[in-house]
């Protein structure tokens, strides 16, 4: 035992001596890393129309700086867009003349900046594409082709409404899937296993009634049976995060849902008693598992965590949206005026939910007697599902030549850090920036100049017309 103690002392003395040499050994004090600002840069991207013969554009807005950081040209008559992966956005260009070609524009990003040349994927000519979606984290895009002609040489009059399957790796249309008349909306379940298509005949031709749903397995593109019927044509689809439900908004405002839990099908279609007349879009909030359905002068807040969707708040009824008083607008606002006890009713047509789940925002507008579009944003507090505030957004003259018939006259998107929400206006030619910390209007970011003639007294061409808005990389 004493021997082991003696050896231990000798080892200890050796270590002390070794540390007392002439060589300096600095004491290293760890320098903690600088963590990124939680309000990291995020973008929103506005897709802008520039008339029937000129290329449209994308406008990139930096959320952290409330500024425009990039502009890129896309194809003629862009109508829709979707983000694919962390650094790529696909823009769908409908094209409007025999000399232009329908296409997908591939916009690459490095951070918040457009990176390199915007690529192009050609689509069948004159196929009138109107919607694009992708499977999450996939390299496949699905595009509606209402006027697709499989053999334009031998059978130029034979139209087969289809969904185009596009590889964004090879930049080619790899297959088509026949669907019902006038496909206008596509949804892919988050697990990438199923594809659903809303077919709406009146959307392509108001004189043609009817509508239907189509369903397919994405692996082999085989059809899935659907049981149940709709009382009016479908206009919007929203899959639930668990891929077990797909919600269907009908043209009459009724909310229906598809039960997709049976592996081989059939998928069961059921209508709910929920109705929001005038609604054309829905926004799914995956954080809270609910839908926001704006329409008319109201918005329905719908809990979809249950088997049967239920309206929450306001005693089971949609929340009414009041008109922002015109006397509360600034004197320079074209919509400014004296108080009236009977303000015009607004039309709600866009919504966005903050990623942090704290609030939702609804875009609405009315047109005054002078032809001005008077827009506003209503704030919904998600903790008690009530209206928190109404924000006036400066008005502007209408531009019915393009915007009266565009599918998305107003669109909305939220910044990735929940600090901003944006309202894009086709008529207004720009993107309105809302500060969510104060629920107040900040600034209007104009779209790029168009190829239209100046409108006196201005000497400059008016801006292009935003027709869609999405959160970006």
Residue ranges of predicted features:
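Predominantly soluble domains enriched in secretory-pathway, periplasmic, or organellar proteins
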Residues: 20-473
